Structure formats: structure tokens, C-alpha cells
Amino acid sequence: MTERNKTVISQFLLLGLPIPPEHQQLFYALFLVMYLTTVLGNLIIIILIILDSHLHTPMYLFLSNLSFSDLCFSSVTMPKLLQNMQSQVPSIPYAGCLAQIYFFLFFGDLGNFLLVAMAYDRYVAICYPLHYTTIMSPRLCVSLVVLSWVLTTFHAMLHTLLMARLSFCEDNVIPHYFCDMSALLKLACSDTRVNEVVIFIVASIFLVLPFALITMSYVRIVSSILKVPSSQGIYKAFSTCGSHLSVVSLFYGTVIGLYLSPSSNNSTVKDTVMSLMYTVVTPMLNPFIYSLRNRDIKGALERVFCKRKIQLNL
């Protein structure tokens, strides 16, 4: 290996989004508004759930954690993207790149596992309504949340440590707007076979298993409804599960489109656009999906604002 190839890099250059220079400021303003909407929307849901005692239920415990996960997941990539869109040298330090990988995996997986917990909650609420409070005890709910955090910590740490053992030499240009693992593996000048095997095995478990559990929950929900078909039962099921099913479809639809669709000549552009869907669009839409047709959230919003208004008048 030549001396040139032995040069160890200290930072990576992020190519960012394939946006023409004349449209750069327009897209910067658009992404800034979308990010601020994401932060504000998820913060409102978290604050409402904390302040309103009517929302201190298992479903809203999971929802508050999901909102926190969405807020942080978007914050892992968006601030750096916005900064680099205004910079002449869109770079990220080596340590910052590893940190971005860790938190990207952590909050992405956390949202995934919380969707499983929410699916189980909906399953119990519809199939065992009389035993709901007994089954979904505070202890079980907290255990599901803690288990989600522990599993995601392990997964994110595993990949980050494996990535840290790789050597990166001459090429330091990442054709993405954040430190994507697959893009980084292509830049490594050391053996990446262990990383690739671990990614395949663990990703299969952490994506396929949660999706299978969610699917099983909804199969049993549909089966339970069909046993006693009534317009009231169907309405209750859709009103209970509609928001969660929309979020699940949005999340897994994007992931399937990104990782399972056939590659093409412009696969880099496709990957970038699909990544924007689950790092920017999905976290922004989730608060609206859960609040627009949710009477509990609307009621909590009215109660909190009315309470604050009365306090101000006094």
C-alpha cells in the first residue's frame, strides 16, 4: 500500500442532496419549515400527554415515547443537512459521523419497537376489552418501553463499534446527506465482510420480526371483528387502529421501498429521496396522523389551553 493510501482521514465530505444551485435556498427554506414543524408537532404531543391526566394510559405512554423518538430521529440528520446546505465545505468529523450512525440507528429502531408495543396495545383493547386494564398493567407497559430502549441501545452500539474498527483512507466523499452505513462501507479500505454479515443478520431480525408481530396483531384484530360483524364494531376498530395503521404503513412502506426495490442506474438519487421520506416526512406527519382524528388529543389540547387561559385571567 502506498503512502498516499495510508493517509488516514479525519473527516468526511457529504455530497448532500441532488439540488440545482439556483434552487438551493428554496429547498433550504422548505426543509427548515419541515424540521420546525416536526419539532413543534412532536413537542406538543409530548407536553399534552405529560400535562393531561386523561392521557396517562398505556397507549399514550407509547405515543409520547414515539413522539420523542421521531423528534430525535429527525434531529440526528436535519440540523447537519441544513448547516451543510449553507456551507461551502459540507463536511462532518469522523467522530461526528460515528455518533450520527449510532443515534440514527438508535432512534430509528426505537420507533420500530414502539410501533410493535402499540400494536399489541390495540390488539388487547379490541380482543380483550374487559381484561384490558389487567393485561396492560403499568408494570408491563414500562417493561415494554424499557425493553425497546435496551434492544435499540444494543443494536446501535453493535454497528457503531463494528464501524469504528474499519479504516478509511483516501476517498472520503459520501454520496448522501448523512453518514449512511452502506455508503461508508464502500469507502472503507479494510475488510468489511464482518460488518456486512452482521448488518444482514441483525437487520433481518430487527425489521422482519417487528413487522411480523405487528401483522399478527392485526390479523387477530380482523379475525376478532369478523366473528361478530357489526357496523359499531368495525367503526370502533378503525377509530382505535386507524392512526397506528397509517403510521405503520408509512414507516414500513418507505423502508420496503428503500431496501427491497430493485436497484437502478440512479439508485443513489433514489436512496437519498427515500431516506428523506423516513427521516424528514414521516416524523413530521406522525403528530398530525395521531391528532387530527383523535378526540383524546383534541380534548387534552382544549383542556390545557382553557386551564392556562383561566390562570392568566385570574
Curated annotation (Swiss-Prot):
Cytoplasmic side stretches: 51-57, 119-143, 218-239, 293-314
Mode of membrane association: Multi-pass membrane protein
Function summary: Odorant receptor. Activated by a lily-derived aldehyde as well as other odorants. May signal through an inositol 1,4,5-trisphosphate (IP3) second messenger system.
Disulfide bond positions: 97-179
Keyword Heme: no
UniProt keyword annotation of Kinase present: no
One BP term from GO: sensory perception of smell
Pfam families reported in the protein's UniProt record: 7tm_4
Extracellular side stretches: 1-29, 79-97, 165-196, 261-271
Keywords: Cell membrane, Disulfide bond, G-protein coupled receptor, Glycoprotein, Membrane, Olfaction, Receptor, Sensory transduction, Transducer, Transmembrane, Transmembrane helix
Free-text tissue specificity from the UniProt record: Olfactory epithelium.
InterPro entries, per the entry: GPCR_Rhodpsn, GPCR_Rhodpsn_7TM, Olfact_rcpt
PROSITE patterns (alphabetical): G_PROTEIN_RECEP_F1_1, G_PROTEIN_RECEP_F1_2
Transmembrane segments: 30-50, 58-78, 98-118, 144-164, 197-217, 240-260, 272-292
The protein, known as: Olfactory receptor 1E16
Single GO molecular function: G protein-coupled receptor activity
Glycosylation sites: 5, 265-266
